[in-house]
Amino acid sequence: MEKDEFFLKRIRELANLSWQRDIVTFSDFLNLNEQNIVSSLKHQFPQIVMETSGGYENAERQMVAFHPDALAFTWEYPIDCLRIEPKALKFSEELSHRDYLGALLNLGVDRSVIGDIVVQKKAAWFFCQNKMTEFFLENLCRVRHTNILITKVEDSDEFPRPVLESVSGTCASVRLDSLISLAFKTSRSSMVSYIEGRSEEHTSELQSHLNLV
């Protein structure tokens, strides 16, 4: 069975199970493409409400909850947030999103049990299915060559808020590389390597020359 066919089958199973048993069912963490596929199926299940959350506002990777329209009880997403920080700040490395994700996947888990990873300064926060929390707490002890401490975030106020800056200016042309170079105050050519094969519009891979209109 093709990957997309298996995914569609699983989503339909979750929706049907929710309706038949009058319960809430949850998907794994989904990427943007998978979320769009789920959204396209909503009309097939008018009796089911589909809601999403990634554990915090504006999360990219999100879990879908399926529940009957007239559900009479409250529920929560089975999502936990864990914080990673170096044991000894003095001897820690500069770690990237890729480093943290690699350390998690090297434990033998599937990407679908992990949500977003947010990196700020010397720490990182990541979201996971709560059934995996104890596993990560017990088994993740190093990221690259840095020994780390990992703890469960109990208070949402501990989660870092994004640092935003308003940028305005004039784009020479309506192109992705032009827009990003304006935002980061650098040349278009220097942005090409960050865009090609790494950016998506409605889940389709973009190249640097893409026109946005």
Predicted features along the sequence, with ranges:
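A short glycine-leucine-enriched loop at secondary-structure breakpoints
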Residues: 184-185, 194
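A generic "binding-loop/recognition-motif" signal
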Residues: 132, 187, 209
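Strongly charged, low-complexity linkers/loops
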Residues: 166-171, 190-194, 200
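Ferredoxin-like alpha/beta domains used as RNA- or RNAP-binding modules
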Residues: 1-183
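Internal, well-folded beta-alpha domain core
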Residues: 180, 187-189, 199
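Single conserved hydrophobic/aromatic residue that forms the stacking wall/gate
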Residues: 201-213
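A broad, structure-centric signal for solvent-exposed, well-ordered loop/edge residues
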Residues: 135, 157, 193, 210-213
